[in-house]
Amino acid sequence: MVLKLLGAAVCLLVLAAYIGGRKSSVGTSASEPLPASASSTGAAVPSGPVILKPQGADGSASVRVGDAKFSVSPDGRTLFVEGGIGRRFSADLEQALAANAFLQRIVITSGGGYAGSGLDAAGSIRRRNLTVRVRSHCASMCVGLWASAAAREMEPDAVIGLHQWRVACDVLADAEQRRECEYSAQFWTAHEKSYEGWLRSAGFNDRLLQLQKQTPADQVALLNVPALRENGVDFRVVDPDGHYLNREQTRRFLLNKYGRRGAD
């Protein structure tokens, strides 16, 4: 949920995969060990997913999740969501859907949040047959929203982040946060199969599901467009205006955006 380093990681991933010409795959077999964690400064670019551990993270849900900002495009067809999946997220989404009957797409930037609100929102997205596009990053519970969509899109420089859901609630000093953490853990245990089912329906293979289960809750495994493609995830790459980009167009988009930084 706490992804302060996402911006730098996004840049590293896309430069390594497209401009530097390096592959960004996740091993060759489900039993292959995961890559070593990258440093928190993002100084190295591994050939697999980038594993980040925000400084001060302790494996607990100790940081309170804020509520995302919602806005609707002038034509009423696109809902823009930016921020955490907080307590009000599902209710805010339902309100936006009810007020905008012609919504077709959600464009989201989120580091994740609470399982209960997120899973409820994923169900709403599924029922409305919405398309979900990732802008910049979508991690933790946000990936469930993306996977549950009728169609998935990613902007070329976007990443998704996976990690497990087991958290150390007992280390929290604040009683309210501890109760909230324990409730989320119980809720997640009861609904884990739904989350995994959505990921599988989106094309996540056993290798990626293993990555999600093996990455500790206080870390995040970031995957870019090439890594997701190579592992069979079903999505389209589009530019910020929604135009489809093939592999060569994606490469050119990133060259134009980032120049030659990191190419050598």
Where are the language model's segments positioned?
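Second-shell loop/turn segments in exported
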Residues: 78-85, 107-113, 129-135, 178-186, ...
